[in-house]
Amino acid sequence: MSNPRHNEREVRSPRGDELNAKSWLTEAPLRMLMNNLDPDVAERPHELVVYGGIGRAARTWDDFDRIVATLKTLNDNETLLVQSGKPVGVFRTHKDAPRVLIANSNLVPHWANWDHFNELDKKGLAMYGQMTAGSWIYIGAQGIVQGTYETFVEAGRQHYGGNLKGRWILTGGLGGMGGAQPLAAVMAGACCLAVECDETRADFRLRTRYVDEKTHSLDEALAKIDAWTKAGEAKSIALIGNAAEIFPELVKRGVKPDIVTDQTSAHDPVHGYLPLGWTVAEWRAKQENDPKAVEKAARASMKVQVQAMLDFWNAGIPTVDYGNNIRQMALEEGLENAFAFPGFVPAYIRPLFCRGIGPYRWAALSGDPEDIAKTDAKVKELLPDNKHLHNWLDMAKERIAFQGLPARICWVGLGDRHRLGLAFNEMVRNGELKAPIVIGRDHLDSGSVASPNRETEAMKDGSDAVSDWPLLNALLNTASGATWVSLHHGGGVGMGFSQHAGMVICCDGTEDADRRLERVLWNDPATGVMRHADAGYDIALDWARKQGLRLPAILGN
């Protein structure tokens, strides 16, 4: 019997200003869905897998075809409902309602675990949407580069006087998210040694210029790192190997990186983490015929890697969990002090979240890189005093290869996001851009996620696991007129450990879009400021007052 999730076809988004749907508000999700499965973007496009283990864009290829066909015929007073990658209904709404509403991987909490999800998945009743895979706004590894860069820069500021020159970062994983690490490290001025078990992924990062070199030899990798750091060069190398083997070996040798982290797909112990002593081929085969054995061996291996990370931490080396839930897996395997080292959000990112600053991104539906160059210039024009952001944009232009439709990631917050959106819409209206722009973000944002082992770890008031916030975020973005809105479970850290929401809005050059953009791109980051103000963070409380937010039970207004 043929696999409904496997097809050798090649999918690429249409380019240019010619519509395939009835309006740009339906053309936009159509193009971004297809862009998610572009072979230059997705990790395993023939299996509908975009990134993050088994994060898919659609449940089956038949469902993909149905979504495409429906978007092509959808009217401006209709909304398509997508349930875990399956187009289940079209309903009459109104022109300011989202054209698509998406719910992916959501389970009643008692059943929210990998075993139950995998059973549903096997029966064709569910799909893992990760964060931006099933919400159709993945832009390749660039999508996480700036966040990783900001993290490394802040780590350098806290631990090394703001200068990472001559320093190096040890990490694991070069998948859709982890692949950003070597480039982010180099941009921050550091060298990077990234361990990756699947050579095809390392080759993907070489091809897209996210990593500089590749080796199968630990000795060679260390020699290169030593030479580069002594010369003050910032370069990166991918080491083909297993992080659960390499990390302990480095501890044994007494090697001391300057920063240690990990972005293997440890959140998914069946599909995301190679067990010690296994070949990749053996691992892939047993995922299908003996997933329990894979999970058991992978979890045991994660414990070994986390113990090595603890050894680095205890040696005084800054060590952080980069949000893949590997500490939780090790804890469940009996490593009682697995959480001794922090996650990256409480360690480095939370002050940004308190001001609603997060991973704002946009893509040029024209397919023309010049449209991104023009929007980059507009960002600089509108935010003339943000030299750190200007530096990022300059480096991004020089170092980041576009994957699929040209796109840009740019961390900005409440008070700036809507200004940029309105400016982009004006550029579409006056013909400065060749076609509309879509603006979205990662679900990893200040007000759109509840994830106690990642974004909401160690909240000041203990509200780490309260998931009302992403639900309110999704509801508000729907009411505000986002073009499509998504509500997911399990992204980043796996089943049972997170709930999160996403939104995308289209700048089609119309005055209606102006009104929607002003609402959505103000309200969306404002929920993040609200969430952190409610938790008692002074930065968020001050920012809420400065921006004039009305928060009755928080500010008394």
Swiss-Prot record:
NAD(+) binds at residues 52-53, 130, 176-178, 196, 201, 242-243, 263-267, 273-274, 322, 492. Pathway: Amino-acid degradation; L-histidine degradation into L-glutamate; N-formimidoyl-L-glutamate from L-histidine: step 2/3. One of its GO terms (molecular function) is urocanate hydratase activity. One of its GO terms (cellular component) is cytoplasm. Its cofactor is NAD(+). It is found in: Cytoplasm. Binds 1 NAD(+) per subunit. GO terms for biological process: L-histidine catabolic process to glutamate and formamide; L-histidine catabolic process to glutamate and formate. The keyword NAD applies. Pfam families: Urocanase, Urocanase_C, Urocanase_N. Its main location: cytoplasm. It comes from the Bacteria. Keywords: Cytoplasm, Histidine metabolism, Lyase, NAD. The active site is at C410. Its EC number is 4.2.1.49. It catalyses: 4-imidazolone-5-propanoate = trans-urocanate + H2O. Residues 1-20 are annotated as: Disordered. Catalyzes the conversion of urocanate to 4-imidazolone-5-propionate. Belongs to the urocanase family. This is Urocanate hydratase.
